[in-house]
Swiss-Prot record:
One of its GO terms (molecular function) is large ribosomal subunit rRNA binding. GO terms for biological process: translation. Belongs to the universal ribosomal protein uL14 family. This is Large ribosomal subunit protein uL14. NCBIfam families: rplN_bact (TIGR01067). GO terms for cellular component: cytosolic large ribosomal subunit. It comes from Malacoplasma penetrans (strain HF-2) (Mycoplasma penetrans). InterPro entries: Ribosomal_uL14, Ribosomal_uL14_bac-type, Ribosomal_uL14_CS, Ribosomal_uL14_sf. Keywords: Ribonucleoprotein, Ribosomal protein, RNA-binding, rRNA-binding. Part of the 50S ribosomal subunit. Forms a cluster with proteins L3 and L19. In the 70S ribosome, L14 and L19 interact and together make contacts with the 16S rRNA in bridges B5 and B8. It comes from the Bacteria. Binds to 23S rRNA. Forms part of two intersubunit bridges in the 70S ribosome.
């Protein structure tokens, strides 16, 4: 579960390495985010030659979470880290590459471009 002030790894090549969650989008009392949810983030650590800079505020979609994801088939899935991909307003990634596996739930939520760029979909 991702909430306010959670630190996330960035799984793309925008230059950001770590971001902090400012807001979980989707309602006034929404507290937690999981795979496929959009959050507003602030860049905490970044490479000097990247697309985004430290302190920049942008939107991101969650692609991996440590907490178990239970599917309708009864299977559960969890990852080793909490990670996100920085996106534009039209739900397309700002970077051109995705690092590491992503969850299949992203395809159902309309992030097919991220799924197609990912090296592995679980």
């Amino acid at each position: 579960m991702i909430q306010f002030m959670t630190k996330l790894n960035v799984a793309d090549n925008t230059g950001a390495k770590q971001v902090g969650v400012i807001k979980v989008l989707g309602g006034t009392k929404r507290r937690y985010a999981s795979v496929g949810d959009i959050v507003v983030v602030s860049v905490k650590k970044a490479q000097p030659d990247g697309i985004v800079r430290k302190g920049q505020v942008c939107k991101a979609v969650i692609v991996r979470v440590k907490k178990n994801i239970t599917r309708s088939s009864g299977n559960s899935l969890s990852f080793d880290d909490n990670a996100c991909v920085i996106i534009k307003e039209d739900k397309t990634p700002r970077g051109s590459r995705i690092f590491g596996p992503v969850a299949r739930e992203l395809r159902d939520k309309g992030f097919s471009k991220i799924v197609s760029l990912a090296p592995e979909v679980l």
